[in-house]
Amino acid sequence: MMITGSSLYAAIDLGSNSFHMLVVREVAGSIQTLTRIKRKVRLAAGLSQDNHLSPEAMERGWQCLRLFAERLQDIPHNQIRVVATATLRLAVNSVDFIAKAQEILGCPVQVISGEEEARLIYQGVAHTTGGDDRRLVVDIGGASTELVTGTGAQATSLFSLSMGCVTWLERYFTDRNLAQENFDEAENAAREVLRPVMDKLRYHGWKVCVGASGTVQALQEIMMAQGMDERITLAKLQQLKQRAIQCGRLEELEIEGLTLERALVFPSGLAILIAIFSELDIHCMTLAGGALREGLVYGMLHLAVEQDIRSRTLRNVQRRFIVDTEQAQRVAQLASSFANQLKTTWALEPLSQDLLISACALHEMGLSIDFKQAPIHAAYLVRNLDLPGFTPAQKKLLATLLLNQTNTVDLSSLHQQNAVPPRVAEHLCRLLRLAILFASRRRDDLLPAIKLEAEGENLTLTLPEDWLDNHPLGAEMIEQEYQWQSYVHWALEVK
């Protein structure tokens, strides 16, 4: 099917640090990204003390928009939204910049209020991020920071604060010195900005905290590169601050996983985030799946926010790769029953059980490529697909489980993922393998009543009397599975 211009949508965000363009098309109630262009314009750096935007900064912005304009020519105007944020809200001569910007792009540019920006960010998060739906969303931009609480699709409080990674860089790291004093000043200033809104945020409360900005993205990249789990904590932020202080100067800042492009505004963003964690007593934060641009796009498409984003993602993937959903359900029921039977001994957390059920939903997707090496194909697809609702570490765990669903077990891959502890990954893998094995006849009426018990790492399977005698192929498969598990010292006893 040819993609026509009318099925395309574009969202452009003229931020204080970067200009971004996102071009998508709608597919099965979700969006498929076709183009993402990002240019570091650092508009906020061109803002003088009396809030005049310098000609040089304006020219950098216009130059970037000329690139964007070429891509917009094929998209209907009513399917394009261009918004400008903090710096253009502040600049007294923003009218001059916007007039030329509209001429270049051939469509209107809307300067949105801080509250509207916060609302759109929240919508972008609600459409793309899994987990508990009572959340606090934090987005540190170039010149403003948005803090939003909400439940499901509904924001309950919206705040846009005048601090950002570019303005804090210019204000507190002017000498490009990464000294403790600079960090202290930057953090204290951020705390002052936060104090007036803290009580209101706490009043609404949240169960999970998600970050939706370049600073949080950079932290995620650092943690993945260093083999840590993906949860951002105050201890990790303090550790990274000490590393930055050791580097001494901004131009010498070297942290494994931190790209050169993000390095310039990383210390200032880090200082703001440390202040937010300390003042709001945040225990842990994860990266959001989308923010402002996604909020704009979903708004144009008028798509309702699904309560369970992961379920929507799994359904879309199953449809796309022609997965036998009845078989996936059968395997999921068995895996769920096994997990419940081991509730007291292995005590899998709800999130771990969810990820096990997600692996069951996708375990046969590799068959759409070829039966041979189907688990390898499935793992590759999961690693490389965009899966809204799943974090990068969760995707890696799913891929690892799918890779190890049959035949030999690659223990090192289960230990290299960092979504769950290695021992939990082993437990999930064992339950998935057994569920697949016992559902192999692909019929509900042939699922045996299996009793599963665990003592430490030793698993005991109790089958109905005469089951092994009446099912020679099944007995052979269980014997083979016993061998595979014993190779990695997983004790499996069959009664």
UniProtKB/Swiss-Prot annotation:
It comes from the Bacteria. Keywords: Hydrolase. One of its GO terms (molecular function) is guanosine-5'-triphosphate,3'-diphosphate diphosphatase activity. SUPFAM superfamilies: Actin-like ATPase domain, HD-domain/PDEase-like. Pathway: Purine metabolism; ppGpp biosynthesis; ppGpp from GTP: step 2/2. GO terms for biological process: guanosine pentaphosphate catabolic process; guanosine tetraphosphate biosynthetic process; nucleobase-containing small molecule interconversion. InterPro entries: ATPase_NBD (IPR043129), GppA/Ppx_hydrolase (IPR050273), Guo-5TP_3DP_PyrP (IPR023709), Ppx_GppA_C (IPR048950), Ppx_GppA_N (IPR003695), PyroPPase_GppA_Ppx (IPR030673). CDD domains: ASKHA_NBD_EcGppA-like (cd24117). Its EC number is 3.6.1.40. It catalyses: guanosine 3'-diphosphate 5'-triphosphate + H2O = guanosine 3',5'-bis(diphosphate) + phosphate + H(+). Catalyzes the conversion of pppGpp to ppGpp. Guanosine pentaphosphate (pppGpp) is a cytoplasmic signaling molecule which together with ppGpp controls the 'stringent response', an adaptive process that allows bacteria to respond to amino acid starvation, resulting in the coordinated regulation of numerous cellular activities. Belongs to the GppA/Ppx family. GppA subfamily. This is Guanosine-5'-triphosphate,3'-diphosphate pyrophosphatase. It comes from Enterobacter sp. (strain 638). The lineage of its organism: Bacteria, Pseudomonadati, Pseudomonadota, Gammaproteobacteria, Enterobacterales.
